Amino acid sequence: MDYEEVRHYVNQYGRLRDVQFSAYELYARKHNLTAKELFVLDILWFSPEGCLQSEICERLSATKQTISAIIKKFLKKGYVTLTESETDRRNKIVRFTEAGAEYVGRIIPPAAGAEIEAMGELSGEDIAELVRLTAAFSEAMRKKFRQIG
């Protein structure tokens, strides 16, 4: 495939990716959240024992300052607690409080259900192919962006 044809597909893929991110952004706004805050809540929801702040940073490719600010917001609202990690006292484990679990329970399960239902509209073969191709493209993107600095 020549350069221009590939560029066309890159642009088309980018628009499709934007549609997906827009769905998250709009859903987050309905709950007075940013998409990044929504993603933090999602990670915590699916980590019942809590999650290290550093793991959240890594998963979201976010700076420590960004995640700390989000955690601080939820801490002030009484939605999370911070506990020192036994292996690294500089790192904190983030967990939901009872109020936080109740609050997030109204946000994340419906969103997760929507994702599952949306993907469920595809055939099993299409789902497997989507995941396989997305993994391959994501790895290629990671490598190429590391090469350019």
Show the residue positions of the predicted features:
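Charged, amphipathic alpha-helical coiled-coil/dimerization segments
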Residues: 21, 72-132
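Alpha-helical linker/hinge and terminal dimerization helices associated
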Residues: 13-23, 60, 103, 107-119, ...
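C-terminal regulatory/oligomerization modules of transcriptional regulators
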Residues: 1, 125-149
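N-terminal helix-turn-helix DNA-binding core of bacterial DNA-binding proteins
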Residues: 22-66
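Hydrophobic structural patches
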Residues: 13, 41-44, 134
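N-terminal leader segment of winged-helix/HTH proteins
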Residues: 1-31, 79
